[in-house]
Amino acid sequence: KTLKVIRKADPDFKVSLAGNYHEEIEPDLYDYCIVIGQNFPEEVRLRRVAENKRTNYYTCCTEAHPNTFTFSDPAEAAWMSYYSSKKHLDGYLRWAYNSWPLEPLLDSRFRSWAGGDTYLVYPGARSCIRFERLIEGIQAHEKINILRQEFEKKGNKAGLKKIEKMLAPFNLGSMPEIPAAVTVNRANQILNSF
């Protein structure tokens, strides 16, 4: 019903949703972000690309790995963008940037939520390793996108295959047995060879 009201008011209004995958409303969503572990059907993902719609994923308190909690392996923040590249998605949604608890420099928890879930930077223009590693991952994701476009344009199948092989180890469920840092560092070495 809500989408009908929106379409009646403005047929071109772009609607976003971060939540579970719902086939019945997917065509009406310009920016659709589903929880990590769920997948867009491949034909839907490809159609969304052709329609220039944003297709992403997110994490929240329920995922132990990967995540950006203060106790998470900092490399998990970079890992998430590599995973997005593997899935051929537009990116990763981080729900909070600076929603600080009362004393963020002393205690990163907010109520029953995991420490650091509500912010990635600290007050007073202070960054943190989680944010810096997230930036690293975003930069890697963008480089992968540029390389894929270049390789496709030039018919460089070997380059495309090398990228896919580099991304193959980014699998949900591999952590913590295979630390994110191991997977990210290997991928960084390969990506930096281009």
Task: State where each predicted segment sits.
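Catalytic-core regions of glycoside hydrolase
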Residues: 1-105
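Catalytic domains of carbohydrate-active enzymes that cleave complex glycans
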Residues: 1-20, 105-194
